[in-house]
Curated annotation (Swiss-Prot):
The record marks 161 as: Tyrosine radical intermediate. Residues 345-353 form a propeptide. The gene is psbA. Keywords: Acetylation, Calcium, Chlorophyll, Chloroplast, Chromophore, Electron transport, Herbicide resistance, Iron, Magnesium, Manganese, Membrane, Metal-binding, Oxidoreductase, Phosphoprotein, Photosynthesis, Photosystem II, Plastid, Thylakoid, Transmembrane, Transmembrane helix, Transport. GO terms for molecular function: chlorophyll binding; electron transporter, transferring electrons within the cyclic electron transport pathway of photosynthesis activity; iron ion binding; oxidoreductase activity, acting on diphenols and related substances as donors, oxygen as acceptor; oxygen evolving activity. Belongs to the reaction center PufL/M/PsbA/D family. Tyr-161 forms a radical intermediate that is referred to as redox-active TyrZ, YZ or Y-Z. C-terminally processed by CTPA; processing is essential to allow assembly of the oxygen-evolving complex and thus photosynthetic growth. Its EC number is 1.10.3.9. This is Photosystem II protein D1. It comes from Glycine max. [CaMn4O5] cluster binds at residues 170, 189, 332-333, 342, 344. The chain crosses the membrane at residues 29-46, 118-133, 142-156, 197-218, 274-288. A quinone binds at residues 215, 264-265.
Length: 353
């Protein structure tokens, strides 16, 4: 009898836990994805803060030349970063217990791998939590779909690219200057500016900014006046009101006359879908571009593609970009190799007579 009561009590505790986890009445929704999201993001955040402040230099290139990234080792907020895991580790799973000591783990950049893997798992669970809450509230799932764009971008630079290049040392450093370094080296090695998927991503980000600004300014300019001239127009809105807060007909007419009639949406739902879809699709393409360039399917190469009737090269902007790429690659990992791969690929002459 005692055993039966204990089992019922444990089932009751589990049931209460399940109801609490999945309740939409909580101030912050947890959900089953949140059960995994909370510890992974807390771990990633805690280790990032500690490592950014106090981590010792990391031998990123695996050539016994450590690179400093933390504040206590001479960096500031701009130059500081979590240095990627050493090339000596490659793609190996490198938890603390795999190192001979904590000092060795820190020297080989173990915190980077720990942070990145927990972060990616955490943001993926955050996306799942968005879907879970939408499902329980009877909403459509497009919030999680939109969030999949930055999740895909983060996965591309922190996981797919290192896998394609063969080492976590090629991942994006977790810092401002480190991000810029990653971008410059990526351009030097993959000519990303000449990749059509990157171009679509630029169109998505800048186009999304333009459309967001246009929409916000049109709505703000066509608000239905509910206040006097001495009051803020914002005071005329009450949360949850059934009436439209702006005149979509006036906004449609203005924009149609400013550009042309069919440039303006006459359906508020299709308009907002477009505002969401444009940047999301653009960032999807950028993430896909990073993922293909990870395996060295690089941007277009139009170097020396224009010649005159005598066969002399007429330089184009593509040739200028190529020259810049070579210069950037020479400066990258300057002690690990002396020449860009493009130049070093030529067979050296024999010196044996």
């Amino acid at each position: 009898m005692t055993a039966i009561l204990e089992r019922r009590e444990s089932e009751s505790l589990w049931g209460r836990f399940c109801n609490w986890i999945t309740s939409t009445e909580n101030r912050l929704y947890i959900g089953w994805f949140g059960v995994l999201m909370i510890p992974t993001l807390l771990t990633a955040t805690s280790v990032f803060i500690i490592a950014f402040i106090a981590a010792p230099p990391v031998d990123i290139d695996g050539i016994r030349e450590p690179v400093s990234g933390s504040l206590l080792y001479g960096n500031n907020i701009i130059s500081g970063a979590i240095i990627p895991t050493s090339a000596a580790i490659g793609l190996h799973f490198y938890p603390i217990w795999e190192a001979a000591s904590v000092d060795e783990w820190l020297y080989n950049g173990g915190p980077y791998e720990l942070i990145v893997l927990h972060f990616l798992l955490g943001v993926a669970c955050y996306m799942g939590r968005e879907w879970e809450l939408s499902f329980r509230l009877g909403m459509r799932p497009w919030i999680a779909v939109a969030y999949s764009a930055p999740v895909a971008a983060a996965t591309a630079v922190f996981l797919i690219y290192p896998i394609g290049q063969g080492s976590f040392s090629d991942g994006m450093p977790l810092g401002i200057s480190g991000t810029f370094n990653f971008m410059i080296v990526f351009q030097a090695e993959h000519n990303i500016l000449m990749h059509p998927f990157h171009m679509l991503g630029v169109a998505g980000v800048f186009g999304g900014s333009l459309f967001s600004a246009m929409h916000g300014s049109l709505v703000t300019s066509s608000l239905i006046r509910e206040t006097t001239e001495n009051e803020s127009a914002n005071e005329g809105y009450r949360f949850g009101q059934e009436e439209e807060t702006y005149n979509i007909v006036a906004a449609h007419g203005y924009f149609g006359r400013l550009i042309f009639q069919y440039a303006s949406f006459n359906n508020s739902r299709s308009l907002h879908f477009f505002l969401a879809a444009w940047p999301v699709v653009g960032i999807w393409f950028t993430a896909l571009g990073i993922s293909t360039m990870a395996f060295n399917l690089n941007g277009f190469n139009f170097n020396q593609s224009v010649v005159d009737s005598q066969g002399r090269v007429i330089n184009t902007w593509a040739d200028i970009i190529n020259r810049a790429n070579l210069g950037m690659e020479v400066m990258h990992e300057r002690n690990a190799h002396n020449f860009p791969l493009d130049l070093a690929a030529i067979d050296a002459p024999s010196i044996n007579g």
